Amino acid sequence: MLFYFGLAVIFLIDSSQTQTLYKVNEVGGSQVDRNLCGSDIPTAIKDICGIKKRQNIPRKYGRDPNNILEKEEFAKRFLRVRRQTTDIVEECCVENCAIEEIAEYC
């Protein structure tokens, strides 16, 4: 909940300019939040990545070494491959970007 509240604060749009934008060249046509360029890009990354880190609360009892879902070799299979063909400037300044796309650069 805190994550979405923080993101809403970051991406407030003037009510006179309210419009919904969608990415059409990607699977799913996800809603984009804002066009970010220049110094807005590192600020957004800092704010979004900081919010994500604060949500990672350490476990009370640690990891169970016998649980296959927590073994490193199994966990790495689920890692998302970062896109190599685009960078954050193209994603957010040229095409507009969604919050999830900014979070990929954390």
Curated annotation (Swiss-Prot):
Write out the propeptide range(s).
19-34, 52-82
Say yes or no: keyword RNA-binding present: no
Check the record and name the SUPFAM superfamilies matching this protein.
Insulin-like
Give the principal location in a single coarse category: secreted
Task: Report the protein name in the record.
Answer: Insulin-like peptide 03
Report the leader peptide range. Answer: 1-18
> What keywords were assigned to this record?
Carbohydrate metabolism, Disulfide bond, Glucose metabolism, Hormone, Secreted, Signal
The task this protein performs is described as: Insulin decreases blood glucose concentration. May have evolved to activate insulin receptors (INSR) in vertebrates. Molecular docking studies reveals unique interaction with the human insulin receptor. In vivo, insulin-like peptide injection reduces blood glucose levels in two models of zebrafish diabetes (streptozotocin- and glucose-induced). Also shorter swimming distance of zebrafish larvae, an effect which is not observed with human insulin.
Which family is it part of?
A: Belongs to the insulin family.
